[in-house]
Amino acid sequence: MSATDNALSRLRGAVHNQVRDFLRTPLIQAPMAGVATPQLAQAAMAAGAIGSLGVGGTSAEKIATLLDRQRELGAPSAHLNFFVHPRAQAARERELRWLEQLTPLFDELGVPAPTELSAPYPTFDDNPQLLELLLDQAVPLVSFHFGLPANAAIKALGRRGTTIMASATNPHEAQTLAAAGVDIIVAQGWEAGGHRSHFDTQPDTQLSTTKLVELLVRQCDCPIIAAGGISGPDDVQTMLALGASGVQVGTAFIPCPESAASPSHRIALADAVPVTQMTASFSGRPARALVNRYVQLLDPVVAQAPNYPITYAAHRALMAAVQQAAASQDPAAATHGDLAALWAGTGAGKSPVMPAAELVGWLMQ
């Protein structure tokens, strides 16, 4: 058997029957909150991959609407990804200092800066409606970022037959996930775009995807999914040859016509040499994004940023100000596409732009 066939066999053996029914290739389209859509997930699943929706920070009501849309498209239920970050701790003085850093940008837009901040959404365990939704709708595949929810939630999902995935950035985190009964571990390398899943109490060791996969394949009995910097067929085959049971690809799917990526995001990815950087300046947690003016201005003072996701509230207010200025046809707003959080991994700009189903085929050739 080829490395691809071996990987597919291992992955199919670990997932819910509803996923196994359509899974023909060991590839996961990454969740990517704000970018992944039911249409993108449906296209990936139609091509035999696992389609995903990032719903961290999304209400149960909105998630139910997304699942209804999946059904309207005639698609199986997508893999849903949730955030399980520590409960945000307010720090009024710190929040005010951060708002002072952003005030010049609000002034450019002619919109007052907020005078206070609060967490824009709760963590998974603080929103019991999320677990109720997953159990009621029997979602077949769920993943968690920034760690795991309470053990009671893991057990309840297991009794319902849900396949559980979670991300690890080092061997100790993987050990924690395996001990909790996680079915599949996503090995998130340093190259990955978007939020870093690191939840260990020790400093981040910044392991590359290749090194992390090598370590986890030897350590773990469950399937390991490689994630980070995977932008072409050679990258895919390298990871499968190392023993990964699949790959998770995100950045390559952002320019797909089925995604919800903004025009500025698509244009930035089309740059001749897109540059990415790990920064906590958008949300308060490290996340890899395309370098733009916001990163250049705020990353040098990121030590002052409030806790995640309170910092996110400040950036959301800034982007609302951009939209407000644009709605009023303020010429200043036209120059502020460089303030957005344009998530991307180190493989940015290295994949062809094509519909999602075609991209799955190209990656797995």
Show which residues each predicted segment covers.
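Active-site entrance/lid segments in N-terminal catalytic domains of soluble metabolic enzymes
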Residues: S2-Q219
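Conserved active-site-proximal phosphate/metal-binding subdomains
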Residues: H195-I225, I230-Q365
